[in-house]
Every structure is written in structure tokens, then in C-alpha cells.
From Swiss-Prot:
Belongs to the aldolase LacD family. HAMAP family: LacD. InterPro entries: Aldolase_TIM, DeoC/FbaB/LacD_aldolase, LacD_aldolase, Tag_1.6-dipho_adolase. Signal peptide: none annotated. Its EC number is 4.1.2.40. Pathway: Carbohydrate metabolism; D-tagatose 6-phosphate degradation; D-glyceraldehyde 3-phosphate and glycerone phosphate from D-tagatose 6-phosphate: step 2/2. This is Tagatose 1,6-diphosphate aldolase 2. Pfam families: DeoC. Keywords: Lactose metabolism, Lyase. GO terms for molecular function: 6-deoxy-6-sulfofructose-1-phosphate aldolase activity; tagatose-6-phosphate kinase activity; tagatose-bisphosphate aldolase activity.
Length: 327
């Protein structure tokens, strides 16, 4: 099935990609970034620090990315110093979720809308949804209705809608556990099937790889839960679960593991259309920024940060498929 795009959405998608491949830098982290910064200083990270670090990353690394994903809370200064060639996605969700309940309900930023995100110069709206396909069905209906609203907003504004799905299990506390690893492919691939339906108005899915590679033979240091063939099957099932373009998130893994995973995904038959890669690219700059200041962080981004993004781009050249084949 080929999906048709409006003229405006197509132009926006082209601005966000290079030759149909989305090699985007993700820096819409808020809660996670504050926690990373807090590891290296005793005082609470300030707004100025967060804005400055985001701006440094944007300025130094967007010349090598097709686009950057930022948040409207701390990322607007960073959006203004990005490379002229780079597209912009803005996050529409509040950071984090209520940990006192298993429902992880979505919530939009109070003073933002798809219209305002477009007015801020973004080529796309990104929204993050936590989803457990086997979870409370009333909760899931609420989530589906929420995504329908955002899809309708994006249609009305004629702006691409990137839906990020982070899966979980209401009964498993730790997503890094072997217990979750065993159900991850089911969680990821079934959620993709749901939100690929036309009613949700999603243009691109931003998703997890369907396997925790740390438990795959040849990748695992410890316990092996999956053979390479079983892992490859999970990627093939993922490819079959949607007609939409989909891109991978790096989920905080190391740059090397993420790159190796992309090669494995492509060899397995996943026709993914790029990445939105965050911490795997810039994580090391946080400590340097706090301990040695902005100039040292800039230097780190120009060397280590550049190396990470350059290596990732080379891997993408060999592994990613253009979204234009699907739309």
C-alpha cells in the first residue's frame, strides 16, 4: 500500500530528511537530561544550563543531521541556531509520566498546539505515547482517542505527525529485564499495527527496535535469550506490522550497539527509514559541559560528538531505506 501525502506534508518531510532518509538528532529530553546533569553537580540544573547545552549540541551537530527534534520548553533557543539545511521537529508532550499508577496517560504541553508548533517554525509535530498492548483496555481506549485528536490537529494544520511509541508492561517494572525482553517484540510490533491505522493520522512512527540486543547471541555479554534467527524474525515481523515509514530511537544505548543493531536490522529485512538518535550521539557532552564548561563541551561535540554522528550516518547510508518508497 502506498500512502499519499499532501503537498505541504511532502515538502516538510523532504526538509526533515536527506534523499528520503531521516537522520535526525533527538534532543527533546527534559526529565532525563536533568537527571543526567544532576549526576555531575550538586545543585539543581538551571534553565540557562539546559538551554545552553541544547544550543551547543544544535549548533555543532545539526550540520551533520537531516533534522533535529527539540522541545518547546527549553529547546527554542537551540532551534534558532541550527544549521539552515536542518529541519525541525518539536515535541508536543509533557515529559515523564505519573509513576504512582500503571496507566502512563499522555498529556500535551499546556500552552502548545499543532498550530503553535507550526508557527514556531517546525516541520513536524512529535508526540510520545507509552503503550502496553496487553494493558487495561479502558486506558488504551483513552490513549487511542488522545492520538486521534492529535492526528486530527496535524491534518488540520497540514503538518506531519511523528508518533513515538514506548512500550511497557503494566506488570513488569523493569524494561531492561529478561522478563520484558521476552515480550518486547510482541509489545512493539502489535502497538505499531494499532497506530498505523488511518484513523490516527500518523505519518511516521518513531519506534524501539523489537529486540533487546543485549540478550541476543553474538551481542550478549551474559544471558542469551534469543538466537540470531529469532531476533531477525522479530525485525521481519516489525517490517510486516506497518505500511508507514518508521524510524528507530536509540533508547539510551551506546553508539556502537545502536550502529550494530541497525546493521542487524537491515540484514534481517527491516526497511526502516532512518533514526531519531539522541543520547547515543551527545550523552558524553553532559559531563564535560558541567565539569569543564561550554567551550570544552563544544570541543567534545566537534570531536567525539562528530565522530558518533558521522559513524551513524555512514551506517545509515548502508542500512536505511528512503521513505519515498512508501509514500
Amino acid at each position: 500500500m502506498t500512502i499519499t501525502l499532501t503537498e505541504n506534508k511532502r515538502k516538510s518531510m523532504e526538509k526533515l530528511s536527506i534523499d528520503g532518509v531521516i537522520s535526525a538528532l533527538a534532543f527533546d529530553q527534559r526529565g532525563a537530561l536533568k537527571r543526567m546533569m544532576a549526576q555531575h553537580q550538586t545543585k539543581e540544573p538551571t534553565v540557562e544550563q539546559i538551554e545552553e547545552l541544547k544550543s551547543l549540541v544544535s549548533e555543532e551537530l545539526t550540520p551533520f543531521a537531516s533534522s533535529i527534534l527539540l522541545d518547546p520548553e527549553y529547546g527554542l533557543p537551540a532551534s534558532r541556531v541550527r544549521s539552515e539545511e536542518a529541519g525541525l521537529l518539536l515535541a508536543y508532550e509533557k515529559t515523564g509520566y505519573d509513576a504512582t499508577t500503571t496507566s502512563r496517560l499522555p498529556d500535551c504541553l499546556d500552552v502548545w498546539s499543532a498550530k503553535r508548533i507550526k508557527e514556531a517554525g517546525a516541520e513536524a509535530v512529535k508526540f510520545l505515547l507509552y503503550y502496553d498492548i496487553d494493558g487495561d483496555q479502558d486506558v488504551n481506549e483513552q490513549k487511542k482517542a488522545y492520538i486521534e485528536r492529535i492526528g486530527s490537529e496535524c491534518r488540520a494544520e497540514d503538518i506531519p505527525f511523528y508518533l513515538e511509541i514506548l512500550t511497557y508492561d503494566e506488570k513488569i517494572a523493569d524494561n531492561a529485564s529478561p522478563e520484558f525482553a521476552k515480550v518486547k517484540a510482541h509489545k512493539v510490533n502489535e502497538a505499531m499495527k494499532v497506530f498505523s491505522k488511518e484513523r490516527f493520522g500518523v505519518d511516521v512512527l518513531k519506534v524501539e527496535v523489537p529486540v533487546n540486543m543485549k540478550f541476543v547471541e553474538g551481542f550478549a555479554d551474559g544471558e542469551i535469550l534469543f538466537t540470531k534467527e529469532e531476533a531477525a524474525q522479530a525485525f521481519r515481523d516489525q517490517e510486516a506490522s506497518t505500511d508507514l515509514p518508521y524510524i528507530y530511537l536509540s533508547a539510551g544505548v551506546s553508539a556502537k550497539l545502536f550502529q550494530d543493531t541497525l546493521v542487524f536490522a537491515a540484514e534481517s529485512g527491516a526497511k526502516f527509514n532512518g533514526v531519531l538518535c539522541g543520547r547515543a550521539t551527545w550523552a558524553g557532552s553532559v559531563k564535560v559541559y558541567i565539569e569543564e564548561g561550554p567551550q570544552a563541551a563544544r570541543e567534545w561535540l566537534r570531536t567525539e560528538g562528530f565522530k558518533n554522528i558521522d559513524e551513524l550516518n555512514k551506517v545509515l547510508d548502508k542500512t536505511a531505506s528512503p521513505w519515498t518508497e512508501k509514500m
